[in-house]
Amino acid sequence: MLIALELSTIWTIALPPITGAIIGYFTNDIAIKMLFRPYKARYIFKRRLPFTPGLIPRNQERLAKRVSDTIMGSLLTPEEIQNLARRLLKTERVQSAILWLLQLAIKQIRADKEQKTAKILAGILSDLFGQSLPRLLKVLARRDDFLEAQINQIFDRILLEFRLTDLQARQLADWLLDTVISPDILRQLLIDFLTDRNIQVIDEGFREKTSGTYWVVANIFGLRNTLTRLRTFCLDEKETANTRLKELLLSLEMRTRLREWLQNLSLQNLPISTVRQLRKTTRDTVRSYIQQSGAQFLQDFNQSIDWEKLAIVVVNRLQASTVVTDSLEMISQELALILERYLEEDLERIVSQAIPILSIDQIIIEKIVATSPKELEAATEGIVKNELQAIVNLGGILGFFVGTIQTVILLLR
C-alpha cells in the first residue's frame, strides 16, 4: 500500500514536467506537418473534407507571391542589385574574364581547321578595300585640305631631299647613253631634224644675224651645203656616222659629265618660289588623280588580290606572334577600365532596365509554385533542424518548466 502510494506521488510529481517537455519539444514538428499535410485534398462523396489539403499547399500560389514581394522589397532592392553588380564587376574580375575570353579566342583560332577566322577576315578586308574605302575616299577627296599635310611632308622629306648616289648616277648615265641617246639614236635624230625646210631656216637665219667675219663666211659659203652633206653622210654611212658620234661623246666626256650632273641634281638647288610652285603642283596633281581615279584604283586593287590567302597568312602570323600573346593582358585591362567608366555612369539605368527583363520576382513565384508540398516540407524541416534547433530545444525547456509549475500547483493543493 505504501509502495503504491509512493509510485502515485512520484508520477504526480514527474509526469507533468516530462509530458510538457515532450509536447514542447515536438510541437514544431507537429506544427510543420499540420501546415503541409495532407498534401492533396481529400474527398468523401465528392465533397472536399475541411482542412484538406494543408494550409500551405492550399495557398501555395499566394504564399509564393508574398515571398517574392518580400524578397524583392527587402532583400533584392534595386540598390542591393546595383551593389551586387558592382562587387561582381570589379575591375580585377572583369579583366580576368576578358583575358580568359581573349585567350580562349586565340586557342579557338589555333584549333580552327576550316580557316573560318581567315574567311571572315578575308571578307572584312575585301569589303574594306572594295566598298568602304572607295566611298570614304570620294567623300574626303572633296575637301580642300585633303592629304595636304601628308603630301607636303612626303615632298619635303623625300622628294626635296632626294639625291642619286654615285652608283645610281653612274647606272642612270650608262642607261641614258646606251639606250636613250645612243650614237645610232643621235644619228637618227640628226636625220629627222635636218629636213630641207629646217636647213633653209638655219641657213637664212645664219646669214641674217651674223656680222663681221661670220657674215662673210655665212654669205660666201653658207650652211646649206654643210648641213645637207651631214645629213647625207648620216644616211649613207651609218656605221661610220655612229662611230664618229661615239668618238665625239667620248671626247666630250659626256658619260662623266652626265653622271656628275645627275648626282648634283636636286630640288634644293631650285629657287624657293619654284620649289613652292612644284610642291603645289605635286599636291594638286595627286589630289586630282585621287578624286578622279582613286576609288576605281582601290576597286581594281581589291580585285587583283586574293584576300583569303592573304588572310590565312595574316592569321597564321598572328598565331605565332608573341606580341599578340603578350598584349592580351594590356588589352583586357584597357577594356575593363572602359567598361568600369561606362558602368559608373549608367549602372543605375542598366539595372533599372535589367530588372524587368530578368523577372526575378516571377522566377521566385514559378520556382515556389513548381516545388511540391512534400519538398517544401522537407526543406522547412531541414532548416528547423539545422538552423533553428535552439528553438526546438527551447520549446522542450518551456514545456518542462510549465509542467513543473503544474506539479507545484498540484502539491500546494
From Swiss-Prot:
Intracellular or extracellular location(s): Cell inner membrane
TM region positions: 3-23, 391-411
Entry keyword annotation includes 4Fe-4S: no
Membrane topology: Multi-pass membrane protein
Domain of life of the organism encoding this protein: Bacteria
Pfam family, one: DUF445
Alphabetic keyword roster: Cell inner membrane, Cell membrane, Membrane, Transmembrane, Transmembrane helix
Main location: membrane
Gene Ontology CC, one term: plasma membrane
PANTHER family: UPF0754 MEMBRANE PROTEIN YHEB
Family: Belongs to the UPF0754 family.
The protein, known as: UPF0754 membrane protein PCC7424_0748
Upper classification of the organism: Bacteria, Bacillati, Cyanobacteriota, Cyanophyceae, Oscillatoriophycideae
